[in-house]
Amino acid sequence: MDTLPKAKVLVVVTVGGSTNSAPMLEVCVILASRGHTIEFATLEGRQKFADPYPFVSAVHIVGPAISAADEEVHYRRFSTWDWDTAAGKRDIVDGKIAFDAFWPETYRRLGDVVRKTRPDFIFADYHVEAAVDVASDFRLPLAVMWPQMPWLVMPQKYIPGQSGMQQRCLTSEKASLTDRLFEMTFLLRSAPYFLRWLFFVRSMRKKEGVPPRQKQPKPDHLVLTNSYYGIEVPRDTPPLVHAVGPILSESWPAMGEPFASFFAARKRICYVAFGTHVILDSAQVDKIMRGLDAALAAGVIDGIVWSLSAVARRRIESERLSSSSSAVGDRRMTVASMLANEHPAWLSCTWAPQRAILAHGSTAVFLTHAGPSSANESVFHGVPMIAMGVFGDQMNNALRLEAAGVAVRLQKKDFTAAQLTEGVTRIIVSERDDFERESARLHKIAAVASRRRFLAADLIEEHLYDWDGRFEHQLLGREPRGVEMEDGTSSPLYVKDADFYPRGRELRPMHLQTADVRMSWVKLNNVDIGLLLCSSAGLLGGFIYMIYRVSNL
């Protein structure tokens, strides 16, 4: 019989979409089955993310809605992501600032939610910096879900530059000197742009009276990554950091019409999807259409399913791309005719049942932006990819998928239609055995690793119970002490946020935290012992020298 106390877990997702919330709520399926209460906090208009999960007992709003127009402007900017140019780096920083601008209101309103609902644990998306601050303010245990290993922490000597920001090489093992130097100097070369972001964040926090967060080499809270080794670069991680992915739903929508008929009639289909937010420009759409049409004409593939979001379609129409064409034989195909489904081998749509498509035996290759969910789903179902990262972690995901042997990587800036045709041909014809072998290998790894969602739930409980027990007063399973306020809510006897949960003194550190983060640099590196040994050696040498001098008098 389970006698462990039950807790209230507050899941927080703000600027992230369903890609961010779904894996977190899948972990919460397990927590809810164990008797824990799950509540969800998000921005206005995003309450729907919790709809598929009936165990979510309450939804809280911690920020304003992002208008469709603002979101489109934001992702148009992100879709021009470029590490190499001044304008590109400026756009990257502008996009990051736009996301971080939600911090003040999220920080205030999330604090209000904590005061009102008294959660025992915060489970936050990695975009929600405010959750880290609120957890610190209230001395609450915290877990953060990342799509990959977190940036700017846990440096490794064998990983050049900043983890998650590599553009050329993932490790130093086979990298050239120039590539290693390129990766290691990236932040230095980008300093003017990133300093602007740092100053913005510092100013924003100062206005709220929140001091800058101290930089640490390791996370000081539980970190769960929706990734796995095989795609993720193996590295030394502290006990507070765990790869628990791929976290995927065990069921998915069935393939209805017109997809079922289209797939039943074909054997080698290329599925194309760039996610909800990627907005391709006219040149990219034109090259993709011509590259795939050439592969179709050559008989490499016999069908194409292209899922284009409504926003992406509007851009095509606004740029009058419909006149772009691809001539094969005695026919001429335009983007407009492709979107209108006037060609029997092409199926265009604004939404596709992606899991059902990837699970279908006729899906031969997936042309993708290499977003975390798409990459995990494709590997899980054993479908090789043409990976063309567009922004953010997609760029590094594409590099990792290529290194794992399950993808051909294209550079979004300068790829050609011929390169796309060649990539499809490599996967399906010329290097078919290699890609099938690697895809089958990673499929099996992903199938086993997907069970780690239970590990994620276990770690949350473990961290929760350790946190509750390492303070003077244990609070789980007890009625909160409080006084009745004028508005009918209960408030603790203490006023300060740090005393809102009357835990008392901290008796011991987190059981998963390594001792080095609490040690001084001198003690950690045994500098004092080195100085003592050097001093002792000097004294001994001086003593021997004195004896030598005296003996020669």
From Swiss-Prot:
SUPFAM superfamilies: UDP-Glycosyltransferase/glycogen phosphorylase. It comes from the Eukaryota. It is a single-pass membrane protein. It is an enzyme of class 2 (transferase). It catalyses: verapyrone B aglycone + UDP-alpha-D-galactose = verapyrone B + UDP + 2 H(+). Keywords: Glycoprotein, Glycosyltransferase, Membrane, Transferase, Transmembrane, Transmembrane helix. PANTHER family: EG:EG0003.4 PROTEIN-RELATED, FI06409P-RELATED. Belongs to the glycosyltransferase 28 family. This is UDP-glycosyltransferase.
